Structures are given as structure tokens and as C-alpha cells.
């Protein structure tokens, strides 16, 4: 029996989401379009298999083939990131980070991470997160120019003496200097943990410096800029840390791994290792630069005055409207983005004075400089006349026509 016959409600809603993804423009920096091949294996019979443990050391029988699959995923991950050890079992980036903390430090130990309101992530010590409840957290941020001041990070580290320093961000448009972070970590005797979830796809293509050999441990998601399935990974070059990480993930915080997702990670890594991937990642940055240039030419303020990666962070501190207003206006025109706090923030986190835009998903659809210039100017048009609902509707129809030339999926399920 087909899904349409068995559960028409879910079938119809899934197809409505397909329509939304195809007709609209996805510019949330952390979202992307994965491969049909990735979705195909995620919907396979591998979902039926329990495989607690690791290849060759399972608690269940019948794991000979999933052992081969997980080993393949591990080897591809190691090759991709040029590291010696990899754990591909984390179900998400947050669980990967949780596993790193459990492996490297003890509850109550101090961690130094990037302030959430400055571009960090919940799992980097935010008080509302378990990382801020189980561990004592302190923070560094960006200056009013939107950039990390590494000397200030050093001062904070010397004062706070953390056991672990987290470098990585969810809304930072500039290159992260992993070597400087390692210098600081060594000065205070801390582990350096790099969370590259948002830039991993650029890192493996050589479009952003690698955290290796500087970081003791590296984590990432496998979706976002990597375009794989939703999941997490942890990597290191230290054998003893690798053993601790493995124990922290299983049996520490997870039971049976999701073998259908691990297989999908392996498929994604194969794509990431191809020459085609390097072309894609380069275009992501090129498109982000086009977006930057148009918005700055149109007199919009960008945090750090530009970008080095896949995202642009707009600041509306000098405007009467908020990040929430901008988010809603673009949404009315079929452009999905997200409101974001900015340096010098004056509004609440639910309103904000900023907007985060990213180019990975549009690039995955085949958008290049010409299309990005069109889209960027439409964004500026909307924000220059933010209450003009007729303009928003007109642009929505124009963008729907543009999107129809770049259909990413012909069907909702694989």
C-alpha cells in the first residue's frame, strides 16, 4: 500500500512542504538540500537494525553488514577531514557536542565559548542549554566591528582559566583563526574544541582553513554546508581522546546508532570527496560575495562589513524596523531567512536588530552570480519599503518564476 493510501494526511503535508521548498527561496544559512541518494538510503531497511556498540564490538548479532557500512562512513570521514579518528554515531550536532564535553571535562568544570547573542550556539555554554547547566560557562564575543578580538579572548581565558575552549559559531561571517585559539588554549592549559557545524562544507573544500592540526577535538553536523543527512560527527587525531569520545557517545549518551543515517552520512561523504564538491563550495562563497556587494551598494549595514564564508549578517540598528520585521517581510515574498541578534543589540532576542542570510541552499539549486544579483536586489527592494505588501506579493510571483528554472526535487519522497 502506498503512503498516499495509508496516511493521506502526512502524504499531503509532505507534498505541501515540497511545494514550499521548490517555489520559495531558502536563505536560512544553516539549511540546505541533501542528495536524493542520501534520502534513498535513509528510507532503506537499514532502519530496522539495532547495532549497539562499534564495528567488531556489537551487543547484537547480525551486524556484519552494518559493521561494513559504519566502517566505510568512518574511513570516508577521516579522509574528508584529514584526521586519524572519527565517530559517526552522534544523532545531531548538539549530541556530538554533549559527547565531547562528557569525554574531555567533568560536570562543574569551566568552559569558554562564544556568546550566543554574538553569534555562538546554545551548546557552547548558554545558560538555557544543558552545556550551561552541567558546566560553568564564561564567554567571549565580537567587537562592535563584528570581529573576534583574539587578544580579548586571551585576556578572558587567562582570567577565567577554563578547562575547555570552544571555537565555532552559528552567525559569524569571518574566518576563524584556529591557530590563535590553540595558542590561547595552550597558555591556560585548556582543551581546544572546534565546532565547525556551519562551515564544514567549506573547510573540506579548502574554502576555509581547517581546525586541524590546531584543535584537540572537532565536531560538526553532517547537513548544513555538507548537504548530508541530519546528524553529527566527532573527529580527533589523539587516540586516547578518541577512546574517551567513543565511550562518551556509547554507552554514555546514546544507545543504538541510527544505521540508516550512518549509511546516509557515508553517501554524503562520498559526494563531499568529489571534485564537484569543490566547485559547489567555491560557488557558495562567490554567491555570498555577490549578496554582500549588492546589499552594501544598496546602503545596508553588514556586521563586519562583509563575509568570508557562506553567510551574511545584516544589522538594522540604524533602521526603524527590526530583524523580526525583515524576516516577516521577506517571508511574505517567498524568501526564508531568520532574524538574528547583532553586536550592540538593543532589542530582545525574540525581536532582534539583525537578519542572517545564507547562500548554500540556493547554490545547491544551481543559482550563480546572475541569479544572486537578482535575488539580492529584490531583498534590498523589500527592505527599503518594508511595509509594502503589494511589492512583496509582486516579488513573490517573480521569484516563483525564477525558482521554477531551478527545481531541486521532482518528488517529495525517495
From Swiss-Prot:
Its EC number is 2.1.2.1. The modification N6-(pyridoxal phosphate)lysine is found at residue 224. Its cofactor is pyridoxal 5'-phosphate. The record marks 223 as: Plays an important role in substrate specificity. Homodimer. This is Serine hydroxymethyltransferase. It comes from the Bacteria.
Amino acid at each position: 500500500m502506498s503512503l498516499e493510501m495509508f496516511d493521506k494526511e502526512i502524504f499531503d503535508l509532505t507534498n505541501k512542504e515540497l511545494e514550499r521548498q521548490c517555489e520559495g527561496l531558502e536563505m536560512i544559512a544553516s539549511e540546505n538540500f541533501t542528495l536524493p541518494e542520501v534520502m534513498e538510503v535513509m528510507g532503506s531497511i537499514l532502519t530496522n537494525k539495532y547495532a549497539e556498540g562499534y564495528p567488531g564490538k556489537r551487543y547484537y548479532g547480525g551486524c556484519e553488514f552494518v559493521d561494513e557500512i559504519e566502517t566505510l562512513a568512518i574511513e570516508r570521514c577521516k579522509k574528508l577531514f584529514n584526521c586519524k579518528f572519527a565517530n559517526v554515531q552522534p544523532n545531531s550536532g548538539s549530541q556530538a557536542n554533549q559527547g565531547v564535553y562528557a569525554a574531555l571535562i567533568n560536570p562543574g568544570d569551566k568552559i569558554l565559548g562564544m556568546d550566543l547573542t554574538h553569534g555562538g550556539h546554545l551548546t557552547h555554554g548558554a545558560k538555557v542549554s544543558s552545556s550551561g547547566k552541567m558546566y560553568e560557562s564564561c564567554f567571549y564575543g565580537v567587537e562592535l566591528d563584528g570581529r573576534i578580538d583574539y587578544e580579548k579572548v586571551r585576556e578572558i581565558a587567562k582570567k577565567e582559566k577554563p578547562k575547555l575552549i570552544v571555537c565555532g559559531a552559528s552567525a559569524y561571517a569571518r574566518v576563524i583563526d584556529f591557530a590563535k585559539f590553540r595558542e590561547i588554549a595552550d597558555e591556560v592549559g585548556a582543551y581546544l574544541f572546534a565546532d565547525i557545524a556551519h562551515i564544514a562544507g567549506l573547510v573540506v573544500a579548502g574554502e576555509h582553513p581547517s581546525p586541524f592540526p590546531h584543535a584537540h577535538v572537532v565536531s560538526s553536523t553532517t547537513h548544513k554546508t555538507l548537504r548530508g543527512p541530519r546528524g553529527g560527527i566527532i573527529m580527533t587525531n589523539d587516540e586516547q581522546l578518541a577512546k574517551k569520545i567513543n565511550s562518551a557517545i556509547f554507552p554514555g549518551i546514546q544507545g543504538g546508532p541510527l544505521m540508516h543515517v550512518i549509511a546516509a552520512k557515508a553517501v554524503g561523504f562520498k559526494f563531499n570527496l568529489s571534485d564537484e564538491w569543490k566547485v559547489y563550495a567555491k560557488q557558495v562563497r562567490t554567491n555570498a560575495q555577490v549578496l554582500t556587494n549588492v546589499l552594501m551598494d544598496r546602503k545596508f549595514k553588514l556586521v563586519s562589513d562583509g563575509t568570508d564564508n557562506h553567510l551574511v549578517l545584516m544589522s538594522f540598528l540604524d533602521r526603524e524596523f527590526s530583524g523580526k520585521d525583515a524576516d516577516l517581510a521577506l517571508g511574505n515574498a517567498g524568501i526564508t531567512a531568520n532574524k538574528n541578534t547583532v553586536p550592540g543589540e538593543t532589542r530582545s532576542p525574540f525581536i532582534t536588530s539583525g537578519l542572517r542570510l545564507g547562500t548554500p541552499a540556493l547554490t545547491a539549486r544551481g543559482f550563480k552570480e546572475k541569479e544572486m544579483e537578482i535575488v539580492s536586489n529584490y531583498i534590498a527592494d523589500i527592505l527599503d519599503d518594508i511595509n509594502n505588501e503589494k511589492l512583496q506579493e509582486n516579488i513573490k510571483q517573480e521569484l516563483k518564476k525564477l525558482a521554477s528554472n531551478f527545481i531541486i526535487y521532482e518528488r517529495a519522497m525517495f
